[in-house]
């Protein structure tokens, strides 16, 4: 799709793995890959300003179609001039399709060929989301990268169910492409599904690749399967996708999963993990997980991470951050959130350098050992 506003440029392949260094060109700028994308569910990354996100090196952020459709409404955002203007963010934005949120409402939804009926989680009213509506909402939001409406089956669903599901997702993808009213300034990605079944992943990938999307997402992972099962699916799925298009692994943010995804050829990742755990005082550091609210840090006047040069670690101590969190001060959450986001954005920067140096496997081994991962307990 040469007229697509989304272009992928391969810079270098790592010699020993499937990892690749590249960049993705969008209407609102170019960002390097592999890249971790902070999640701004309600058109804001929780507690962080756009200036802070730029400062830490976030080249692209994600916003949530489902939540913005319900509140404040996609038509209001369109009248504001689109999501970039509405939230004062002049760099790339990716929107999901809303599908994952709808499917997480398992007790109140009904799937048909036309779309999904579900209850609005805010007021209980009946709502309907179709492939066409999901595209229309995203066209109003004006994101640089959009997602096709898909069904996200549980990883351990029976084979026959998953087969019917991916075939419907392919039909929905085709309907979404036809409904896309802004193909010259918004790029629409297809989403490969298929749970853990290699032949169904292949069928899904072949269907979507034949439609010539400007990029492809790998969905249906990080939904309860083991780390090893996720890697196995990536091992056989990413080679099914075109080398000249971006590859996006949805909903993945644990540090080892990011590195292992890159090794298997993934370019883009997103997850709420860094900000969600930060609100409970859990921090990612170069030496593993640190729960700064714990009593042992009451008089610890050192940074969260001795090897981190982020704003938080350059200015504040564990003892001070612990005090803020124990006192329910919002500034404490701002500091832990900034640090965790910076940690993952900076991890991807280090990964990009390791690809350039052809030593990603050595980098992974050193990182895993320092972080304290072991087979009995991953501790993200």
Swiss-Prot record:
Record's keyword terms, sorted: Glycosyltransferase, Metal-binding, Queuosine biosynthesis, Transferase, tRNA processing, Zinc
Residues covered by region (RNA binding): 251-257, 275-279
Catalytic reactions of this protein: 7-aminomethyl-7-carbaguanine + guanosine(34) in tRNA = 7-aminomethyl-7-carbaguanosine(34) in tRNA + guanine
Residues that bind Zn(2+): 308, 310, 313, 339
Positions of the catalytic residues: 96, 270
Free-text remark on how the cofactor is bound: Binds 1 zinc ion per subunit.
EC assignment: 2.4.2.29
Single GO term (MF): tRNA-guanosine(34) queuine transglycosylase activity
Summary of subunit composition and partner proteins: Homodimer. Within each dimer, one monomer is responsible for RNA recognition and catalysis, while the other monomer binds to the replacement base PreQ1.
Family per record: Belongs to the queuine tRNA-ribosyltransferase family.
Function per UniProt: Catalyzes the base-exchange of a guanine (G) residue with the queuine precursor 7-aminomethyl-7-deazaguanine (PreQ1) at position 34 (anticodon wobble position) in tRNAs with GU(N) anticodons (tRNA-Asp, -Asn, -His and -Tyr). Catalysis occurs through a double-displacement mechanism. The nucleophile active site attacks the C1' of nucleotide 34 to detach the guanine base from the RNA, forming a covalent enzyme-RNA intermediate. The proton acceptor active site deprotonates the incoming PreQ1, allowing a nucleophilic attack on the C1' of the ribose to form the product.
Family matches, as HAMAP family: Q_tRNA_Tgt (MF_00168)
Name of the featured protein: Queuine tRNA-ribosyltransferase
Organism expressing this protein natively: Streptococcus sanguinis (strain SK36)
GN (gene name): tgt
């Amino acid at each position: 799709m040469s007229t697509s506003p989304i272009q992928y440029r391969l810079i270098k392949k790592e010699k020993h793995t499937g990892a690749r260094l590249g960049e993705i060109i969008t209407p609102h700028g170019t960002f390097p890959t592999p890249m971790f994308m902070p999640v701004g569910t309600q058109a804001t990354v929780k507690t962080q300003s756009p200036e802070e996100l730029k400062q830490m090196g976030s080249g692209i952020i994600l916003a949530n179609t489902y939540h913005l459709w319900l509140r404040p409404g996609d038509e209001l955002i369109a009248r504001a001039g689109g999501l970039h203007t509405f939230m004062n963010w002049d760099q790339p934005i990716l929107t999901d399709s809303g599908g994952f949120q709808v499917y997480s409402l398992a007790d109140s939804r009904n799937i048909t060929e036309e779309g999904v009926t579900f209850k609005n989680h805010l007021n209980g009213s009946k709502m309907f989301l179709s492939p066409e509506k999901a595209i229309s909402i995203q066209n109003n939001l004006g994101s640089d990268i959009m997602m096709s409406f898909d069904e996200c089956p549980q990883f351990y669903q029976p084979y026959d169910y998953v087969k019917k599901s991916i075939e419907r997702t392919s039909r929905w993808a085709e309907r979404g492409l036809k409904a896309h009213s802004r193909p010259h300034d918004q790029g629409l990605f297809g989403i490969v599904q298929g749970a853990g079944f290699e032949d169904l992943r292949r069928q899904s990938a072949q269907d979507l690749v034949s439609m010539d999307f400007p990029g492809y997402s790998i969905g249906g992972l990080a939904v309860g399967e083991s780390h090893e099962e996720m890697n196995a699916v990536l091992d056989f799925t990413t080679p099914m996708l075109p080398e000249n298009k971006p590859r996006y692994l949805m909903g993945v943010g644990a540090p080892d999963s990011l590195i292992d995804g890159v090794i298997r050829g993934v370019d883009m990742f997103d997850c709420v993990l860094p900000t969600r755990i930060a609100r409970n005082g859990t921090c990612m550091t170069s030496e593993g997980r640190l729960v700064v609210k714990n009593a042992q840090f009451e008089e610890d006047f050192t940074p969260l991470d001795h090897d981190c040069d982020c704003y938080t670690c350059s200015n504040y101590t564990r003892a001070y951050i612990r005090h803020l969190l124990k006192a329910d001060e919002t500034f404490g959450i701002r500091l832990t959130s900034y640090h965790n986001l910076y940690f993952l954005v900076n991890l991807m920067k280090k990964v990009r350098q390791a690809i350039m140096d052809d030593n990603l496997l050595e980098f992974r081994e050193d990182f895993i050992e320092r972080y304290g991962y072991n087979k009995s307990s991953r501790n993200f």
